[in-house]
């Protein structure tokens, strides 16, 4: 059977399966996703949809992670190599059983080096493996292009690592012609940061050039949501949660994230352990119940 036809059948099966099951939405990514701010904004928009207010939504991002399996020499002071998503992905999919996976990788996959064909191919292979594993598990998968690198200090990005991320993102976008669902956040983020700096020259997207601040996470969420909503046929014109409501969702997200990372297991040292899964789910249910009252 031709590989393209097989991929089409797998994708069709995943979408039919997802339509029949209760929504179980999984976010995967590196430290920017682990931080959880952009995912919580998106979660609030998902919970505003009819029938999704109590959907199971879990962020299992993991700091330092790649899809490529690459790690630069001396990473983390030589204490450990970057974790490889594929070491844990099978367990995550088997245990959580997502109907939808939203994955954002790339920023670590280039290991902060100039654009290189070998590293780029490793990223592409890792993404292909990620996508196929999700589809084979019965999940719909939506891939998000990498975010920005050093937009506040472009003159210091001497190897043009943001350009590496643009190249990685361009490859992802090109896969739309093969039926992939891809959200391209890179152009939106540049526009949003440029507009913010024009309004306030002191605005900073990422103090360390990598991890966005709160406003940067909001920009990411906006960029994701404007494409995710039509892809999923959700109502796009909804407001993200704010204030006390947003905090309740963050508390719920953190307790589930920590429990699920511990439950599924990983090889990244220094990650805070969580509650036993049943206890975490009960606490999350309490947070969501309070969230829905406000």
Question: Language-model features: where?
Answer:
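Sec-dependent N-terminal signal peptides
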Residues: 4-13
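Serine-esterase "nucleophile elbow" of acetyl-processing enzymes
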Residues: 17-71, 78-79, 89-97, 101, ...
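Solvent-exposed loop/turn segments at secondary-structure junctions
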Residues: 31-34, 62-68, 100, 106-112, ...
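Extracytoplasmic/secreted envelope proteins and their assembly/folding machinery
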Residues: 39, 43, 86, 90, ...
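Conserved catalytic region of serine esterases and O-acyltransferases that act on ester linkages
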Residues: 51, 178, 198-294
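The substrate-binding groove and active-site-proximal loops of carbohydrate-active enzymes
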Residues: 78-79, 111-122, 155-163, 211
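A short helix->loop->beta-strand "cap" motif at the edges of active sites that frequently abuts
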Residues: 135-140, 180
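Substrate-gating cap/lid alpha-helix
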Residues: 151-186
């Amino acid at each position: 059977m031709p590989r393209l036809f097989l991929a089409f059948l797998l994708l069709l099966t995943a979408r039919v399966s997802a339509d029949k099951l209760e929504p179980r939405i999984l976010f995967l990514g590196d430290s920017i996703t682990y931080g959880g701010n952009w995912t919580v904004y998106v979660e609030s928009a998902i919970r505003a949809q009819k029938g999704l207010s109590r959907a199971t939504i879990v962020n299992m991002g993991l700091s330092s992670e790649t899809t490529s399996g690459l790690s630069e020499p001396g990473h983390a002071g030589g204490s450990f190599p970057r974790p490889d998503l594929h070491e844990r992905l099978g367990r995550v999919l088997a245990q959580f059983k997502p109907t939808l996976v939203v994955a954002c990788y790339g920023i670590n996959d280039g290991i902060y080096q100039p654009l290189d064909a070998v590293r780029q191919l490793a990223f592409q292979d890792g993404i292909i493996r990620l996508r196929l594993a999700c589809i084979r598990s019965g999940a719909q998968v939506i891939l998000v292009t990498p975010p920005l690198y050093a937009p506040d200090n472009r003159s210091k990005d001497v190897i043009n690592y943001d350009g590496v991320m643009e190249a990685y993102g361009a490859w992802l976008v090109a896969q739309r012609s093969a039926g992939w669902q891809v959200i391209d956040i890179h152009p939106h983020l540049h526009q949003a940061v440029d507009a913010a700096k024009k309004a306030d020259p002191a605005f900073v997207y990422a103090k360390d050039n990598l991890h966005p601040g709160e406003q940067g996470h909001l920009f990411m969420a906006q960029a994701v949501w404007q494409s995710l909503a039509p892809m999923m046929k959700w109502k796009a014109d909804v407001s993200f949660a704010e204030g006390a409501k947003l905090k309740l969702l963050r508390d719920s997200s953190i307790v589930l994230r920590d429990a699920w990372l511990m439950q599924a297991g990983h090889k990244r040292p220094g990650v805070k352990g969580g509650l036993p899964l049943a206890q975490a789910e009960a606490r999350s249910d309490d947070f969501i119940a309070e969230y829905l009252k406000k």
